[in-house]
Swiss-Prot record:
The gene is lipA. It catalyses: [[Fe-S] cluster scaffold protein carrying a second [4Fe-4S](2+) cluster] + N(6)-octanoyl-L-lysyl-[protein] + 2 oxidized [2Fe-2S]-[ferredoxin] + 2 S-adenosyl-L-methionine + 4 H(+) = [[Fe-S] cluster scaffold protein] + N(6)-[(R)-dihydrolipoyl]-L-lysyl-[protein] + 4 Fe(3+) + 2 hydrogen sulfide + 2 5'-deoxyadenosine + 2 L-methionine + 2 reduced [2Fe-2S]-[ferredoxin]. It comes from Vibrio parahaemolyticus serotype O3:K6 (strain RIMD 2210633). [4Fe-4S] cluster 2 binds at C94, C98, C101. This is Lipoyl synthase. One of its GO terms (molecular function) is metal ion binding. The keyword Zinc-finger does not apply. GO terms for cellular component: cytoplasm. Belongs to the radical SAM superfamily. Lipoyl synthase family. The keyword Mitochondrion does not apply.
Length: 321
């Protein structure tokens, strides 16, 4: 019997080391043949990378993190080149170890008390009008990091009074009511929590998460803040069926969610869950029509759509693919 890995505090565990820590072994020991990316999944990189380097430099200077980098988002070059980024608070080490995600797992350090102020100053320096704030899961904190979210929202608005804030929150497992109570006085302009996939695949893709719990989080926030739109996102290509996705859309609408993102899952490495299929753009178009028929007011559906991809345009209801 192999000896369990002893995690050191503040150390990032990635790829094979991260996957070895997942208690439920649901991936094959030998990776099956990797699917070739179709033409519609090819990305054209921008010719000028100066804007990208400027944003990375601003992040490093203020010791901030972006989920764009930490999760190896395929849209990083495009978004950074347009001067947009999704900030990731509460460190860059997650207490969960989802096998689809490239964010590092481990024992995180305590939250940095000055992070809300640094974040607000950086956003002001970048002259952003719309910002997305997300975080790693922090199951080690009594409030799951909710107070830190509230502090960030407050500090950002003090320095940037005209800004719109979207928060992409974790599930606050076991502490939902505490978290919602802490955030009630400083709510975002858009509240986002991703279901990620169909409930049948949760044991495989989201160990430690609960489908019904996530739906309840979205519902309870909406009940507390009826004027704040709620949003959720799903990946496709993990083995779900189209019918399962439609059932999830119905569940989201039944829990008050009006904004939706659907995108293609891409495996960050051979150690992560493999892509089961590449969903053609036409199928994303069909699902967008279904979403609008179900009553979603905003539905961004396409191979490269991610939760925060052109989030400002998503909030305006503009076409995103």
């Amino acid at each position: 019997m192999s000896k369990p890995i002893q995690m050191e505090k503040g150390v990032k565990y990635r790829d094979a080391d991260k996957m070895a820590l997942i208690p439920v072994k649901n991936m094959p020991t030998e990776q099956k043949e990797v699917l070739r990316k179709p033409d519609w999944m090819k990305i054209k990189l921008p010719a000028d990378s100066q804007r990208i380097q400027d944003i990375k430099a601003a992040m490093r200077k203020n010791k901030l993190h972006s989920v764009c980098e930490e999760a190896s988002c395929p849209n990083l070059a495009e978004c950074f080149n347009h001067g947009t980024a999704t900030f990731m608070i509460l460190g860059a080490i997650c207490t969960r170890r989802c096998p689809f995600c490239d964010v590092a797992h481990g024992r995180p350090l305590p939250p940095e008390a000055e992070e809300p102020q640094k974040l607000a100053r950086t956003i002001a320096d970048m002259k952003l009008k719309y910002v997305v704030i997300t975080s790693v899961d922090r199951d080690d904190l009594r409030d799951g990091g909710a107070q830190h979210f509230a502090d960030c929202n407050r500090e950002i608005r003090e320095l940037n009074p005209d800004i719109k804030i979207e928060t992409l929150v974790p599930d606050f497992r076991g502490r939902m009511d505490v978290a919602l109570d802490l955030m009630k006085d400083n709510p975002p302009d858009v509240f986002n929590h991703n279901l990620e996939t169909a409930p049948r695949l949760y044991r495989k893709a989201r160990p430690g998460a609960n489908y019904k719990w996530s739906l309840e989080l979205l519902k309870k926030f909406k009940e507390q803040h009826p004027d704040v739109p709620t949003k959720s996102g799903l990946m496709m290509g993990l083995g779900e069926t189209k019918e399962e996705i439609i059932e999830v859309l119905k569940d989201l609408r039944a829990h008050g969610v009006t904004m939706l993102t659907l995108g293609q899952y891409l495996a960050p490495s051979r150690h992560h869950l493999p892509v089961e299929r590449y969903v053609p753009p036409s199928e994303f178009d069909e699902l967008k029509e279904v979403a609008l028929e179900l009553g979603f007011t905003h539905a961004a559906c396409g191979p490269f759509v991610r939760s925060s991809y052109h989030a400002d345009m998503q909030a305006q209801g503009l076409e995103i693919k």
